[in-house]
Regions:
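Autoprocessing Asn-cyclization modules and mimics
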Residues: 2-78
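Short, surface-exposed tryptophan/glycine-enriched loops
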Residues: 161-186, 190-191
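Terminal (often C-terminal
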Residues: 1-6, 77-132, 142, 150-159, ...
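Beta-strand signatures of extracellular beta-sandwich domains
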Residues: 44, 137-141, 184
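Surface-exposed coil/turn segments at beta-strand junctions on protein surfaces, enriched
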Residues: 31, 111-115, 131, 164-166, ...
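Extracellular repetitive beta-rich solenoid segments
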Residues: 32, 47-48, 58-73, 106, ...
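Conserved "cap/hinge" positions at secondary-structure junctions
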Residues: 38-40, 122, 187
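A short, structured loop/turn motif at beta-sheet edges
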Residues: 113-115, 141-148, 175-182
């Protein structure tokens, strides 16, 4: 199983207009370039150092610039380049790997190390900070080619007050895999503003981090003769 759940904390407070590098406890779990969620604002960045995000764009994906104080939670989000361009969905951690592994160069690719028939099941958590309902489409590719009939469309409601609309999309697909075959998850957003996002851990009540993306792969059988 694999997941994406980048999380850290803000080390130095930022004003509502600052575009200087953002200092955090650690960027180890974040991909670059990328985007982050801090309270109700999404911020794009182009690069990272061990403790900073650089190349900052404030108020992305329909959110508004606000000031943030040191100590608040920061989590990773994945957006699309635009309403007409889809994005692959990379993973940042491996929970268990038997016959399937992440490509070390491109972590959006989940590669077979043992040939067989596999059941791939995913869940993806989407947030919408705009005032308009949005549709998100998710599908799978094998070796860079769309898998027929693998797409599904789910609606993400508009925000309510300061809280985003949210939903979790989840389904599964059985795929024949030879050694070194790989699958990828892709998504698109009709508005271009809905993101796949990690929620921080809760304190009252206490609950664990809610990953933006989870994928499990179960070996079903050997390939048909």
């Amino acid at each position: 199983a694999f997941h994406q759940d980048g999380a850290t904390t803000l080390a130095v407070g930022i004003s509502n207009v600052s575009t200087t590098p953002i200092t955090v406890a650690s960027t180890a779990e974040f991909l670059a370039p990328g985007a982050l969620l801090i309270e109700s604002e999404i911020i794009k960045y182009t690069g990272v150092t061990p403790t900073t995000f650089t190349g900052i764009t404030r108020g992305a994906y329909g959110t508004t610039n606000v000031a943030h104080t040191a100590g608040v939670a920061i989590t990773e989000v994945l957006g699309v380049p635009s309403a007409t361009v889809a994005a692959p969905m990379p993973f940042t951690a491996t929970d268990a790997s038997y016959g399937i592994e992440l490509d070390p160069i491109n972590t959006a690719r989940v590669k077979a190390t043992v040939a067989g028939v596999y059941n791939f099941a995913f869940s993806a958590q989407f947030l919408n900070y705009t005032t308009v309902d949005d549709n998100v489409t998710v599908w799978m590719k094998k070796n860079g080619v769309d898998i027929p009939y693998s797409a599904g469309v789910t609606q993400v409601s508009s925000k309510h007050g300061s809280s985003p609309g949210s939903t979790i999309a989840a389904w599964n697909l059985v795929v024949d895999m030879n050694v070194n075959d790989y699958i990828e998850l892709y998504f698109s957003s009709t508005s271009g503003d809905t993101v796949c996002a990690t929620f921080p851990a809760g304190t009252a009540p206490v609950h664990p981090i809610s990953p933006s993306l989870i994928l499990s792969a179960t070996f079903v059988s050997a390939l048909p003769a």
